[in-house]
């Protein structure tokens, strides 16, 4: 086991007596300090404070309730002695800035009575551009150096002799950026270094009158061509509706040439029905919706699916045509009046390889576009439309021979068609008795 340190009873008694003595002495000093230093937390000075006795230069009264002896220039309140409170107003209301408090001992003076040559505390109420202009005019020369401008400013204004030399940077910036000043290069025969500066004659009067205190950017100049185009665009936008399409004269002329060039190929239909030109004197066109298609447009002979020979053979089908006139002219008087009640419908399936495409004894191979394998819907529709026209043409060029036997009679007879294995009764030979079986 560890041995615990033991303290002698005599030492403990001595330390306890010493502690009690120190405690009694501290209590006495604390009570005395409370009685003496009670003024540190007292606000009685705030009640006695007034504006009349707040003057620093006023001599303090001999009688003091707290027994303090005021010296000349001593603060009239405990807070005034704090370094953080220096420069702050002693009374609420009007705050005092640091710049005005430094010159408060000089008193308030009018601006006309201030001598800027001898007063180092007041900054001249002039801009840097005005100071430069004053220095140039005082020199009685057409051009002046930068060092001469510095010298004239420091000679006539004491403030700049004692101020921070950063004001010289402001002078250089004004000379470089302000358009009222022009830099004149030094001649080769002139002694010294650096260039000269002078006032632009067109801005001299305005600068002296105080109109050019601040450097202003010149107004943005717009080219006359862009200005006229912008004005025309704004005028058109005000007159036209948001859905109105504006077309200039050049585009209008190109559109006319395009319609004339494509008129022979049938594009004139689009020009007549797709666009309705509504002229208001300014070459405007408004797009109108296409009218509802009530009839099927005739097939054009310039279809890309027909070769040159087929287009020659289909010459009679160009434009609008009448079936009866074509039938009468092609068949030389053959009566096809029954076709008036015939409704021509497109075939249910595309043309296959077995279709006879012989025209005037010449065989034409079926184009690859007619095959149904691997075709999209648009190609199938085009082939259906072409089949209708081509079959009608082939029928007109070589009609079926009259001595041709019926297709139904060649393929099957009556007995095979109705599957009749027995002979008809004798009484069925009489056609009059056939009605009883029906």
From Swiss-Prot:
Primary location recorded for the protein, binned into one broad class: nucleus
DNA-binding region: 123-217
Keyword field: Activator, Cilium biogenesis/degradation, DNA-binding, Nucleus, Transcription, Transcription regulation
Entry annotated with the keyword Signal: no
TM stretches of this protein: none
Cellular-component GO terms for this entry: nucleus
Pfam families registered for this protein in UniProt: Forkhead
GO terms of biological process kind: axoneme assembly; ciliary basal body organization; cilium assembly; determination of left/right symmetry; protein localization
GO molecular function: DNA-binding transcription factor activity; sequence-specific DNA binding
Subcellular location: Nucleus
Task performed by this protein: Key transcription factor required for motile ciliogenesis. Activates genes essential for motile cilia formation and function.
Entry similarity comment: Belongs to the FOXJ1 family.
Protein name as catalogued: Forkhead box protein J1
Name of the gene encoding the protein in the UniProt record: foxj1
